[in-house]
Amino acid sequence: MRRKAVDNFELQRWRALSAAEALSAIADYAKIDASFRPLKSATSTRWHATVGDLHFEILCTGPKFWDTRNKAGGCGAVDLAMHLLSIDFKHAAAMLRTKGL
């Protein structure tokens, strides 16, 4: 089966997508931490998420994310999917399409 190529419009949309929105769609469980008070950007939020048996604490600011436990981050839904699911770009793109993102 041949995979559909990712066009620039789709890639730009995924890069600009809010990390919090992408996290909610990708993770099996995601809950915002209402007690979190950001120090740098007032728009930052902290999320507790589960993917399979793995637990994450993710800071989200617009399309950017930072995994506080694994000390890794990135920007955009593709990077987030690759990080959370330990998959490559092609599988991340297919998964994002499946989720309707």
Which residue stretches match the model-derived regions?
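N-terminal structured subdomain of primase-like DNA metabolism proteins
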Residues: 1-101
